[in-house]
Amino acid sequence: MKKYKRKLIISNRDDGFGERMCSLLNAMYISKILNFHFGFVWKNKVDSLLYQYKKTDRYLCCNDCIDKEEIFHSDFIKKFHYDTIPSSIIHSFFKMKGKSIYILKNKPYEYSFGHQSCQEDLSTIFSDVKERQYRKLLRKSWNEIQFSLNFRHIMLEAEKVAKMFEKGFVAIHIRSGDIVFEFKGYSRWLMFSAYKAVSFNLIASVIKYKLNYIENIIIFSDDTDSSKILKKYCDNKIFLAEEFLCDKHLSNDERSFFEIILMSKAQEIYHSGNSGFSRLACFIGVSRSICIYKYFSKIQQYNFILDNIDELRLSRQQKAYSYFMLFIFAREMKLSKKKQMFFLEKGYEEDKNNKVFILSQIEIYFSLCDYEKANQIIKEIVYKNEF
């Protein structure tokens, strides 16, 4: 490892493009504020969704990351990239929430080289990081990144598309990905990840009832099939980001980059709970960030999904996810256990590979002290070896 008198703040996430770039920008920000040396680690990665759907044009795999040489200029890599530091999928500063960012200067450091960066909005963590100044410095840092010639070309193409909308546009980011389509993502529904995605049924109603006065709406989604169904449901009055692609043969990272640049030019960005894709667009632009789960009440979201759950002809996985969100809203609003169970049963009918519906049913039976029914389901699971 290179030796520096100043300590290192390193960006070394190992997940999706958006999260990696958010972490990289945060590392650049911290280096400026605390006079640390900035560095990054970038390992290529192929997402399993890519293998599953590589012969189709149905899904954009935002977790598929190509080599650093295809994204960044060689000068940027030579100056800031580290091969000797391992990549890491998760790192957070939330243990420092409410404290000053200058606490990072206190010894001992987290690692011998200094600190790892995180991908989150630092203005929601550190008490003295003010959003306006923070985002201004993030944009400055973004402009300092030396991208490859190809990625600079893609950036210019996205900016051209944005200029086509003289009156501006509103962006809606519908995140699905591994949360909705991958078996490994299902178990996380019981924790934080259910809110990381967003239901197409919910978005359809938001457009129909709350954004019907907006002239230009662009949908950004990793599920292209569902996006087309949504557009038809909205009488073709919305645009899909994929319609503006400068090259239909772009790689996943190239397409992600194009869409993030375009999204960053929106006046407002409606997004799910915590997606790196839309967060990065907010980091590098001046858009108003609107989290759907915070902007609308639980009862509104609940009714939004119910409004078209039988009309919107989505895939079974998407419909199962919508039913699970109905279950979550019903539980949080303390609706009857019978109603909660109804949504779980409907969701399981749509996707019997997703055992989260069964686990949630068991939880309800335990809460009702119906141990006999809970044990019966558990025995069936063990007998069938379904877990």
Question: Predicted regions span which residues?
Answer:
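Active-site donor-nucleotide binding/catalytic segment of nucleotide-sugar enzymes
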Residues: G168-N201, I218-T224, I328
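Donor-binding and catalytic core of enzymes assembling or modifying cell-surface/extracellular glycoconjugates
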Residues: I214-R288
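Alpha-helical protein-protein interaction scaffolds
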Residues: R316-F387
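Catalytic binding pocket for nucleotide-activated donors in carbohydrate/polymer assembly enzymes
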Residues: N274-F329, D351
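Short, basic/hydrophobic alpha-helical segments
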Residues: S199-E215
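Secretory-pathway glycan-assembly enzymes, especially type II membrane glycosyltransferases
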Residues: K3-K184, R188
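Short, aromatic/basic amphipathic alpha-helical patches
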Residues: L50-N63, S227-N236, I377-I378
